[in-house]
């Protein structure tokens, strides 16, 4: 019995060229009706963070709707060594600016010292949803940042 083998050739598939997508300026720039207000809130929070950028505290980002203030001093927290510790962040989200205040995450009693109006904005362990360009709220955030910085300084994290 004779077997016939036929060579099967594959057609050449054209190579795909990568198409670069334009990166949006802000994560939700075209999805939120209140976006112009959110940009103002973001810029105000960023201004509150600037005085604390000194020594090992470095500001990262500031564009694209994200800014982070991080202490680059190696620390030990709850028995774990960390190369850095995050302090405060602001991120433009859909419908609000996330004000991430990490001192409250590691020191729950700090929440009792913060103003009740600011605490109403707390929606997670350390994330405050800031939706209004409210001067009173900015004063409360400024006080919170100072308290948090003093706490970090007390612990030797700055």
Tell me the role of every PLM-derived stretch:
Residues 2-158:
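Charge-dense, helix-prone N-terminal extensions
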């Amino acid at each position: 019995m004779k077997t016939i083998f036929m060579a099967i050739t594959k057609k050449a598939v054209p190579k795909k060229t990568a198409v670069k997508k334009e990166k949006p300026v802000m994560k939700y720039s075209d999805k939120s009706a209140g976006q112009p207000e959110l940009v103002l809130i973001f810029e105000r929070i960023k201004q509150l963070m600037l005085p604390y950028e000194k020594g090992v505290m470095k500001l990262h980002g500031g564009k694209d709707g994200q800014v982070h203030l991080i202490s680059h001093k190696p620390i030990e927290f709850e028995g774990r060594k960390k190369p850095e510790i995050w302090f405060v962040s602001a991120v433009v989200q859909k419908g609000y600016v996330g004000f991430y205040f990490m001192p409250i995450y590691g020191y729950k009693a700090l929440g009792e010292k913060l103003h009740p109006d600011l605490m109403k904005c707390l929606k997670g362990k350390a994330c405050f949803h800031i939706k209004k360009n409210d001067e009173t709220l900015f004063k409360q955030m400024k006080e919170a940042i100072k308290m948090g910085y003093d706490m970090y300084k007390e612990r030797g994290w700055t």
